[in-house]
Amino acid sequence: MEPFNLKSFKKKMMLNRSTLRRFLTRVETKEPKGIDKVQHQEDVEVWKDMDCLACANCCKTMSPTFTNDDIKRISKHVGMSAQAFRDKYLYFERGDKDWMNKQQPCQFLNLVDNKCSIYEVRPRDCSGFPHHTKKKVLDYTHVYKQNVEYCPATYKLVERMMYRLEGEKLK
């Protein structure tokens, strides 16, 4: 596995973002036959070369949504009341009606080793990220469109699916 370089990922993503998004839009418009099987196969391959601790871009640039159960579990773990936890770390996003981090990078991310200080009790949104196999591809293209910009594993997955299904290679 070669060392991960976040700066080169961001350059590559900027260069290929529109191509990947167009592919995902085509998938939404006309679902390719066998895409879910291809997705599962390529997901296995992608994770052979990915190390989340080498990146942690999701924790540095995105906020998970916190459910009420997440808030109760995490606040208990850090020795705070749920209300004190919300007041200190979260804000309520009125549009989506979600609890989100007030700051990025995440307050629980150790920026030296990219490890989460609450890993055992982290939000459900974090434990499932990047949500590759959560639902069928067609039901989750909107999530791929968002995550492809932040997550190298999602970028690589969409790139590999595009090549397998359409034979198109990125720059």
Regions found by a protein language model. Give the residues of each.
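Short loop/turn segments that flank or connect secondary-structure elements
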Residues: 1-171
